[in-house]
Swiss-Prot record:
One Pfam family here: RsmF-B_ferredox
Biological function: Specifically methylates the cytosine at position 967 (m5C967) of 16S rRNA.
Localization annotation: Cytoplasm
Gene Ontology CC terms, in alphabetical order: cytosol
Sites where the protein binds S-adenosyl-L-methionine: C251, A252, A253, P254, G255, G256, K257, D274, D300, D319
Name this protein carries in UniProt: Ribosomal RNA small subunit methyltransferase B
InterPro entries listed in its UniProt record: MeTrfase_RsmB-F_NOP2_cat, MeTrfase_RsmB-F_NOP2_dom, NusB-like_sf, NusB_RsmB_TIM44, RCMT, rRNA_ssu_MeTfrase_B, RsmB-like_ferredoxin, RsmB-like_N
NCBIfam families assigned: PRK10901.1, PRK14902.1, rsmB
Keywords, ordered alphabetically: Cytoplasm, Methyltransferase, Ribosome biogenesis, RNA-binding, rRNA processing, S-adenosyl-L-methionine, Transferase
CDD domains membership: AdoMet_MTases (cd02440), Methyltransferase_Sun (cd00620)
E.C. code: 2.1.1.176
Lineage summary: Bacteria, Pseudomonadati, Pseudomonadota, Gammaproteobacteria, Vibrionales
Amino acid sequence: MNVRAAAANVLYQVVDRGNSLSTALPEAQQSIRPRDHALLQEICYGALRYLPRLESIAGKLMDKPLKGKQRVFHHLILVGLYQLGHMRIPAHAAVGETVEGAQALKGPRLRGLINAVLRNYQREQQALDEFSVSHNAGKYVHPSWLLKILQDAYPEQWQTIVEANNNKAPMWLRVNHAHHDRDEYLQLLKNANIDSTLHSEAMDAIKLAAPCDVHSLPGFEQGWVSVQDAAAQLSFNYLQPKDGELILDCCAAPGGKTAHILERVSAREVVALDCDEQRLKRVTENLKRLNLQAKVICGDARNPEQWWQGEQFDRILLDAPCSATGVIRRHPDIKWLRRAEDITALAQLQSEIFDAMWAQLKPGGTLVYATCSITPMENVEQVKAFLARTPAAQLVGSERENPGRQILPGEEDMDGFYYAVLVKQA
């Protein structure tokens, strides 16, 4: 299929149908040549990143919106506008390929309209670009409800957060310590002419100067290295697992944190629990590539009686289901799929899982509560509420008035993440 047509289909699936980009994009990639996968990804990610600006420009250039069965052609116009405004593709190629996309989408009669809209944008680009950022939705390209949360929670930092969310994310690696230490792998990258730098805190993290195909990484197929953001790798630092312990990774998919534990310690057993059977397949695949073994269980963390084997855990990593507002730069569709009311519902779910997991922790054991969110309701407020109702919970490494550590997007080039460490008093 024409790449621009495929991109329009992805935008339609995400924006109009509410499907996630992580589902829609791989499906679309199956319809195009492998060499075009990166181009399709760049167009889809970029168009979703700057969606309100593109929508406002399209609205100015069209007499009436395309509706119903023609909605996919509306998204094709957005694809064309993104290429012209944000990519280095020659204008004639961007316009020509986008117009041809209408043919691939079985709308040849709309080719003239699409061509006219894109040509008019070229003629009036400066004025239209200025108009597209003249309102908050276009200036910050975040939904108003999320912008308000960020402004209230981070009055001095919200603009930095927004900027980080709108930037492309770097590619972080986690070196498998069972094969190489980080300095050794850094040298392997250097030998392969791959520029990279170390992280100051995450002991196995390396940041690439530019993203690359994983198969070009030394020893990827042999399990020497994995792709994982440095903020997620810090889960190991906070959990501090020891040899011989019984450890639970709750809400474990896709398995990066489970693997990190196994790469670093000889636990008696690591249990990887998740309620999504399809996502658990990723856990199994990742462990297989890394030649690691864990007990993988499909079950609801709120109902341990369905899967628990009767022995409490020494350590529990609770990477709770969350709004994922800390990883928007990696998943720009979150801005348009998430709703304000989702935060309240997720906080309730987190609370239920928190209580259920605490009962599975040994006296003297450690539970690390983690999210990839930056909303206080899911993080600081969640932990405060848990401490208030759980006398045996002792907070470690932070103050009760401001529990845990909130990593903001872009901090040391990391994703947004939250960690709180709790010990169960005997």
